[in-house]
Regions:
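Sec/Tat signal peptide C-region and signal peptidase I cleavage site
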Residues: 22-28
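N-terminal soluble domains immediately following signal/targeting peptides that reside
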Residues: 30-189
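Bacterial N-terminal signal peptides that target proteins for export
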Residues: 2-14
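Compositionally biased amphipathic helical and low-complexity segments enriched in hydrophobic
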Residues: 6-9, 28, 189
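Cleavable N-terminal signal peptides
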Residues: 14-15, 26
Length: 189
């Protein structure tokens, strides 16, 4: 005895096609792609649109405060407070050519969503436990054609950061560079 599935096939194709058309836009707001979580590394996305420069930072919390759990001690709470102060000051985190006349406007910080655990203080982090800092820095550049380079000073200011992957998007195109303590300046054009 043969079972014929052909009469069901057109309906199945329509259902699958419907999912590809309707579902992705409905889920788009819930999906946010993040770079891999790597200790010692941060990701910067720098986009120049007209006169506005926006730099986004994504970093494991361990790079910023030295841990990835909810702060438990006065020292850890002080580190979180100092991180908020540092990441709120976009003037201190990035150097640019003075000829570009870029003026820092604002910073938006998204602190980590700490995972609460029953860890014992002084013990290593639980495997798989991750927390990230995200920040967005906005600048107005009155001579954007002169914005030829960017130096992420945060390589010196954030704990344990050895590398910054800088993704750059300008009217001239997109590309990526890696900044390290030995090679801090990245080309913007």
């Amino acid at each position: 005895m043969k079972i014929r599935l052909w009469p069901l096939a057109p309906a199945a194709y329509c259902a699958v096609a419907w999912c590809f058309v309707v579902c992705p836009p409905a889920l788009a707001d819930e999906f946010e792609q993040h770079p891999p979580h790597e200790h010692g590394k941060v990701t910067l996305n720098a986009a120049l649109d007209g006169n506005q420069l926006v730099i986004e930072l994504d970093s494991p919390a361990v790079n910023v405060v030295g841990f990835e759990h909810e702060p438990r001690t006065d020292g850890e709470r002080a580190a979180v407070s100092a991180a908020a102060k540092l990441l709120g000051n976009g003037r201190a985190l990035f150097a640019m050519p003075s000829e570009a006349r870029c003026q820092f406007e604002k910073a938006a910080l998204k602190p980590p969503q700490w995972e609460t655990t029953d860890d014992v203080p002084g013990q290593p982090e639980a495997p798989g436990q991750h927390a990230d800092y995200e920040a967005r820095f906005t600048y107005q550049c009155w001579s954007p054609d002169h914005l030829t380079w960017l130096e992420p000073a945060l390589l010196d200011k954030l704990r344990n950061v050895t590398e910054a992957r800088v993704n750059i998007a300008t009217a001239r195109g997109q590309r990526s560079e890696v900044a390290t303590s030995g090679h801090v300046r990245v080309a913007m054009q």
